[in-house]
């Protein structure tokens, strides 16, 4: 895998990160502005509104028959099959470091030398264990094994698969700390059905789990980084069946499947996602911003559409990108409803 190719991928990833911030703002912003060179983000003007007042008592309003009814309150915890023996969730909390060793810009996993990275991971584990003494913390390394690209590549799929030597290297780091490993897939213009089978030899190990990033699943035919991609229930159900088959074939404990999300359309028809006791599903709130923005996105895209378990991503740099922004503390994340059982640092 050429470093230059990953650098090119990070240009598109930076563009996508700009979109990520803007989508987290929701109705406060209109439109989408991409910039390959500007660090500043262009905000559209927002409309101001004031509450109407009356000199005399205001007349009673007749309810609008066409008004949108209030959505029912989401049901948490989700009614799901009882956990099988060996299940990690919900009686543990996973704490993962995310990235790729070939790039210092894709996350903490590749930003610092391995020994320093593992030491920092252990310190985070200790910090989270103190914040919630009732829930054991399980460390993990979350490796992007299929990286979306800004160029088509030889097969025109706009994605690059990491070679086995890199995957085994990161797996060795995980083994040193008795940590889990997640293999993360950015599908590009390929299909989830084509991008999972080659990972079977890694997923056959009891401590290796799967993640898929809908942001880079380009079903519309657009290039990665130009628009935000999406997955539907059929895609996720295929991944669930694939993992369940591996659990049965190799007689393994249940697998964890992480699906990233930070917009409405990244995950479509969530009610059609089937629950299988052999696969534990985490919807991971993946957007970056200040605490109010992140809490709002969690409520809108994760809490409001229950699947099974929830996750929350924290960005060491982007969550502090602008003046007044800061990284959320473990205590603040644990105050979310429902409490995330998967924590990821990038």
Question: Whereabouts are the PLM-identified features?
Answer:
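Chitinase-like catalytic core of GlcNAc-active glycosidases
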Residues: 134-179, 189-205, 209-211, 218, ...
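Boundary at the C-terminal end of the N-terminal hydrophobic targeting segment
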Residues: 38-40
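N-terminal module-boundary/linker segments of secreted carbohydrate-active enzymes
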Residues: 52-114
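Structural preference for beta-strand elements that scaffold enzyme active sites
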Residues: 94-96, 136-142, 178-182, 207-211, ...
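Bacterial N-terminal signal peptides
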Residues: 27-33
């Amino acid at each position: 895998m050429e470093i230059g190719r990953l650098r090119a991928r990070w240009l598109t990833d930076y563009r996508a990160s700009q979109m990520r911030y803007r989508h987290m703002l929701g109705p406060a912003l209109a439109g989408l502005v991409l910039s390959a060179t500007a660090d500043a983000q262009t905000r559209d003007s927002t409309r101001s509104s004031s509450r109407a007042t009356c000199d005399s008592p205001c007349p009673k309003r007749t309810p609008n028959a066409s008004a949108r009814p209030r959505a029912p309150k989401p049901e948490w915890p989700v009614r799901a099959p009882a956990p099988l023996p060996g299940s990690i969730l919900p009686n543990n909390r996973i704490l993962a470091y995310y990235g790729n060793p070939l790039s210092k810009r894709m996350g903490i996993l590749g930003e610092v030398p391995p020994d320093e990275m593992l030491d920092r991971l252990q310190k985070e584990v200790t910090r989270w264990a103190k914040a919630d003494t009732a829930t054991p913390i399980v460390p993990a390394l979350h490796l992007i094994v299929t990286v979306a690209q800004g160029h088509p590549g030889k097969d025109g799929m706009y994605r690059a698969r990491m070679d086995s030597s890199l995957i085994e290297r990161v797996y060795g780091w995980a083994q040193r700390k008795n940590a889990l490993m997640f293999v993360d897939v950015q599908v590009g213009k390929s299909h989830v059905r084509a991008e999972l089978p080659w990972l079977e030899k890694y997923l056959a190990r009891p401590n290796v789990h799967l993640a898929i990033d809908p942001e880079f699943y380009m079903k519309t035919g657009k290039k990665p980084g130009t628009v935000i991609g999406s997955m539907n229930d059929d895609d996720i159900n295929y991944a669930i069946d694939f993992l369940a088959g591996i659990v049965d074939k190799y007689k393994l404990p249940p697998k964890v499947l992480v699906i990233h999300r930070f917009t409405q359309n990244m995950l479509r028809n969530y009610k059609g996602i089937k629950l299988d006791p052999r696969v534990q599903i985490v919807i991971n709130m993946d957007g970056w911003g200040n605490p109010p923005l992140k809490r709002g996105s969690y409520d809108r895209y994760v809490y409001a559409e229950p699947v099974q378990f929830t996750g929350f991503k924290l960005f060491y740099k982007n969550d502090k990108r602008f003046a007044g922004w800061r990284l959320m503390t473990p205590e603040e994340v644990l105050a979310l409803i429902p409490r995330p059982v998967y924590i990821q640092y990038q």
